Amino acid sequence: MRVYHSNNFRSGRKIIFEKEPCLIESSEFVKPGKGQSFVRVKLRKLLTKQLIEKTFKSTDSLEIADVSEYTLSYLYNDGHFWYFINNNFEELSVDKKIVGVNKKWLSEQDTCVITFWNNQAISITPNIFVELKVIDTEIALKSDTINTTTKLATLSTGAILKVPLFIQIGSLIKVDTRSGEYVSRIK
């Protein structure tokens, strides 16, 4: 069993805490004037995305999480499973619960990062920016600019978001998957 001692806790490292894989988001070493030094850590549970703040003594250690990340290309879905392919042309399936809300940013042939723990997919991270086609939107009138400068648009993946009035059906747009917001039009 490999372990990290608390003085080796660094941002980005993955550990096992309370029998779950966690990502260290930040760590701060504190040496008080009186008493034992300690490390204040912010952990993100990889299974539930819950953020935890925890303090460890300088003598504590935690097991290293055997977590691996692979960049895979999305192929298709059958409603229950989402299928991806790696560079060796091996097909992998991921349950729709794991894909979750990220399904609205995945279109065929897009790459994404899938995180595995104990040979099971635990999370999917789509590209930060994706290019999607607008399949439905309202027609903007000249008088619409008085009250609002955006309208709702439905994208090829089913996602609905606010776009500027000049975006039309068939337009390709760039979307930020972290915030779910329109970034720019692609010409």
Swiss-Prot record:
SMART domains: EFP, Elong-fact-P_C. Keywords: Cytoplasm, Elongation factor, Hydroxylation, Protein biosynthesis. The modification N6-(3,6-diaminohexanoyl)-5-hydroxylysine is found at K34. PANTHER family: ELONGATION FACTOR P (PTHR30053), ELONGATION FACTOR P (EF-P) FAMILY PROTEIN (PTHR30053:SF12). The keyword Protease does not apply. GO terms for biological process: peptide biosynthetic process. CDD domains: S1_EF-P_repeat_1, S1_EF-P_repeat_2. Gene3D superfamilies: 2.30.30.30, Nucleic acid-binding proteins (2.40.50.140). It is found in: Cytoplasm. Belongs to the elongation factor P family. GO terms for cellular component: cytoplasm. The keyword Protein biosynthesis applies. Involved in peptide bond synthesis. Alleviates ribosome stalling that occurs when 3 or more consecutive Pro residues or the sequence PPG is present in a protein, possibly by augmenting the peptidyl transferase activity of the ribosome. Modification of Lys-34 is required for alleviation. It comes from Buchnera aphidicola subsp. Schizaphis graminum (strain Sg). It comes from the Bacteria. This is Elongation factor P. GO terms for molecular function: translation elongation factor activity. Pathway: Protein biosynthesis; polypeptide chain elongation.
